[in-house]
Every structure is written in structure tokens, then in C-alpha cells.
Amino acid sequence: MYREDYKVTVPQFKRLEVLLSDCGAISGKLDIETGRHNARVINDKVKELSENGGGTIVIPKGIWASAPIRLLSDVSIRIESQGLLKFIKSKEDYPLIITNYEGQPCIRTVSPITAENAVNVAITGMGMVDGSGDEWRPVKKFKVTDKQWEQLLKKSDNVFETKETQIWMPTKSSLLGNEKNIQSDKDEALEEARDYYDFYRPVMVSLRHCTNVLLSGVTFMNSPAWNIHPFFCENVTIDNIKARMQ
């Protein structure tokens, strides 16, 4: 295929915008209940828009806690400058599921942002998405300063040795999960894995079997595991985003 024959297909959306702050969402509070409330508001509005031709949810300036959200067809989320969508870790809100890792069935938790079999979806704007990955991720000692390592040990004393370095784990559950590493597509494995919940870090943005996807302008930060995972998607446009683990 020659370059001049290739066309970038980006999603188009109905010219209807809904401001999150007008829908009953709460800004400035970073607790589990606020996150659940805001996620309900967002998910309800996504469903309503998708069922009525689509549109855009605008997240304005401010800090907005959330539990997992799911994008549906013909819906865009735009995060304005100085707007932060921060996902709050909670075992009840992020259940374990069987999904894929490098093409193989595996166990993870639900992702903060998911779209599956959706057509025309987008996350845009100059704001930020924070996946609270620092509550999930292991840390290798040689990647931090001595002072930072001391601070980590004050949070958790769960450390194991490798030939390369010491690795800090945020919880006992994640440490034991690393030793067990239960991976299977069987329901009984999913049940057994519950004892090692914190080990099964989610990807932050999970896009599965979607068509016409746009990610533009947003900073995706502090991811629990992989930052953005498009899996068997078509026409994915990534434009001027920042993706970082911290």
C-alpha cells in the first residue's frame, strides 16, 4: 500500500456535550465512595449518550475521583486542561477477571477504563488520567534513590531478592501472588487467585475489538501495569498524548 492510498479514519461524534459537573459528579474528594459515585454518573451518562446517537462528556478543571468506567459506541470523553480523572483502588470495584496477556489467557483485575466491541470512541483533551499505579506496582531498588527506597519500606516491608536487585512489593498479597503466579482460564483458578489479589495489576486503558478509536492530547499517568492496550482494534489514532508509568 502506498502512503497516498492510506487514509486515517478518526471517529466523528454528535455535536452534543455534557459537562460532568452538571451531572451531579463531585470534585476535590479522593475517597472510594466519591469514586464510586462519580463512576456511576459517568457510566450512566455514557450509556444514555450511546443509546441516543452519542456525544461527548466533558470533564472540567478539577480533581475527579472515579471507579472503573466503560466507554460505549459513539461516545467521547474530553478532559479539559487542569482536569484530572483519578481512579481510586478498591478491591470491590476492581474484581478479578480472565482476560489476555501477550495473546494468552490470564487473570487480571478490571481496568480503570475499558471499551469492548465499541465503534467510534475517544479520550481527548489536555487533562490527565491517573491510574493510582503506585498502589499496585512493584519497585526495583536500583531504579530509585536510597531515600525513596526508605520511604517505600515505611509503606510496606514486603521485599524479595533476585540476582539483579531487591524488589519491593506494595502488599503481602502482591508478594505471595508473585510467588504463586496463578494463571489459567479456569474458574477455579480465578477463585484461588483471590487470595493474591494485589498481584493481578490491570492495564489502565483496555480497548478490545474496537473500531475507530482516538486518543489525543491526554496525559495517561501512574498506570498499574501496561498503560494503553489496544487488543484486536481497527483504526486506532494516537495523537500527541503522553503515556508514563509515574
Annotated model-derived regions:
Residues 1-246:
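Extracellular/periplasmic carbohydrate-active domains that bind, remodel
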